[in-house]
């Protein structure tokens, strides 16, 4: 389980002009919603939100400390909107969760073993960066791992090869391609021959 992150928030006025003023003042307008929850328009500090997303991604349980409320709201980031030119976050949707109930959200795919595949003469082309999962908020993984260190032949690697931790269900179609391995110049045989030649060459006397 990931550590629960902390985020400051305050209620805000709605409307495009109010949102524009908030962004100029260093805040991101957003909303908290969820099953049985009255939607609440909020704003969060831009720097704090950007740092949280950059360091931890979107797949984390967050304690949103809304100004004036005694207890934090347990939320996850459901959607981020970014400026097409600056990539700065312009709006954020938070889903308020019950830690005892499962939720669906998107987390990144972490590929390991890519260097081994490249040493075998394979070119790795990434097709899918994130995957939708279902789990309890307390079991959200940082990422879903895909290990391709054992791939020796060209071809697609699909969602079926993802290693989901206990308590996490991957919702994507198992046949969806995550990445493709193709032969580089010289192919697998030449790369293996070069590797063997390199390992058999000892240090100069």
Swiss-Prot record:
Keywords: Ribonucleoprotein, Ribosomal protein, RNA-binding, rRNA-binding. GO terms for cellular component: cytosolic large ribosomal subunit. The keyword Nucleotide-binding does not apply. CDD domains: Ribosomal_L25_TL5_CTC. It holds the Pfam family Ribosomal_TL5_C. This is one of the proteins that binds to the 5S RNA in the ribosome where it forms part of the central protuberance. Belongs to the bacterial ribosomal protein bL25 family. CTC subfamily. HAMAP family: Ribosomal_bL25_CTC. This is Large ribosomal subunit protein bL25A. The lineage of its organism: Bacteria, Bacillati, Bacillota, Clostridia, Eubacteriales. The gene is rplY1.
